[in-house]
């Protein structure tokens, strides 16, 4: 069955413009044809913020109860806590020498980076390499801290960072198709609460305008 056929088959399982409950959306998703690979389950949230205004940015982090199902490779930039970073499970650990290595070969064999504060001036050297890929450690995304161990451990347990895109939307992987409905619901409930907690004070009125649930290859299901 081709991808286009799978998407067509998934569309036959629900009404495109109907808004379902989260439980109903998860039941529909479970019935959809599966791809030959392990698909991610994603939530797409449309907010009412004005993304052009600096005081209306949505940004934060959350440790999903059941993680995302993905093994995350973590790079830890630190001069003083390298042993702690290694013990916490960091895949790549180093200080100035690691910064220099990345500046030379531009290879990024990791999914997320954390750092201790003393490394931030040194990381400026590779900011143009890390930044475009969303890998630059930042206090707002809770990837910079005085203690490196909890930063690494949180990411290994399923911590995710989120922020709005240029359209004021938030996109997040919340699990895999192999997860149970209960696991996906718990992850989603937790993530949505974190989004609500991070509503900008400058954003007035209804914050979340719409939400869509989908897997990598499926059509999107609107839910509330």
Put a short name on every predicted segment.
Residues 90-194:
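Long, charge-patterned amphipathic alpha-helical coiled-coil/hairpin "stalk" segments used as oligomerization
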Residues 47, 78, 116, 174-176, ...:
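Flexible glycine-/small-residue-rich
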